[in-house]
């Protein structure tokens, strides 16, 4: 464990994701996982279950070589977009970044906040955290994926993506990651269908837009809602990490306020 790694990682995390920083900064790190030195030198990770049985997460011999060999089977050089399922000590992501460009998108999903807190103490993650294409999601509710993935929906749907799994971690949280992957696949499949539909009917869409243009221009828009609910507070709710953080507060206050939701946030709020 080195304080310099932790300090550097927290500084990087605070710059790129203040919400995740606030979630992690007070955690001390998981006691279910053990970090030791591999025979080749870099740290390795193992898991101790409730019966005291040890399970290796990364190779005890050479975790870097293990990650490299696995990624070769995925032909990552053919991919621009990556979904990393299970972070661990980050060896797979470090190898992806070696050949990544500024256009590469790497979305990382880790279930265990305490494991992530432990990893920040053991490995310098600054190169991962500060890569412009990296987004890191820790203990994210799969129901909120719409908002989290929306900014890259078209990119991932058109250019596809490579799923990279830290299998030993996925196996430890199988129910969570199975649901997560199912929701991700469903989300991007729907996006592909929508893009195909738009392509087929694009002329009709533009025809309808121009046909309705006068009505758009004459519509009072949101001004028509002015003073509709005097003395009743209203909240406009978007999707994303902030919704994940505040949804319980919104649910407990629903009878005291008027909630306006974007489409991607509606389902989780119902």
Predicted regions located by residue number:
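N-terminal donor/sugar-recognition subdomains of glycan-related enzymes
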Residues: 1-258, 267-270
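Acidic, glycine-rich loop-and-beta core segments that form the ion-binding/anion-interacting portion
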Residues: 263-264
């Amino acid at each position: 464990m080195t304080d310099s790694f932790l300090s550097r990682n927290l500084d990087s995390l605070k710059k790129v994701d203040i919400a995740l920083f606030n979630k992690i900064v007070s955690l001390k790190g998981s006691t279910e996982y053990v970090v030791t030195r591999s025979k080749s030198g870099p740290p390795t990770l193992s898991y101790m279950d409730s019966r005291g049985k040890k399970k290796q997460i990364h190779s005890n011999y050479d975790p870097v070589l293990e990650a490299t060999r696995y990624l070769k089977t995925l032909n990552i050089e053919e991919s621009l977009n990556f979904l990393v399922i299970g972070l661990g000590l980050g060896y797979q992501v470090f190898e992806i970044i070696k050949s990544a460009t500024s256009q590469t998108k790497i979305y990382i999903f880790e279930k265990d906040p305490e494991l992530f807190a432990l990893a920040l103490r053991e490995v310098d993650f600054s190169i991962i955290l500060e890569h412009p294409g990296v987004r890191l999601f820790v203990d994210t509710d799969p129901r909120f994926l719409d908002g989290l993935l929306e900014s890259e929906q078209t990119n991932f749907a058109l250019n596809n993506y490579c799923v990279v799994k830290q299998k030993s971690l996925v196996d430890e949280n199988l129910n969570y990651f199975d649901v997560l992957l199912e929701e991700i696949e469903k989300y991007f499949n729907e996006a592909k269908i929508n893009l195909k539909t738009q392509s087929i009917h694009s002329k009709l869409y533009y025809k309808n837009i121009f046909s309705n243009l006068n009505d758009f221009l004459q519509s009072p828009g949101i001004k028509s809602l002015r003073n509709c609910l005097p003395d009743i507070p209203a909240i406009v709710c978007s999707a994303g990490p902030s919704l994940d953080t505040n949804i319980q507060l919104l649910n407990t206050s629903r009878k005291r306020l008027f909630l306006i939701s974007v489409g991607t946030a509606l389902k989780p709020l119902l």
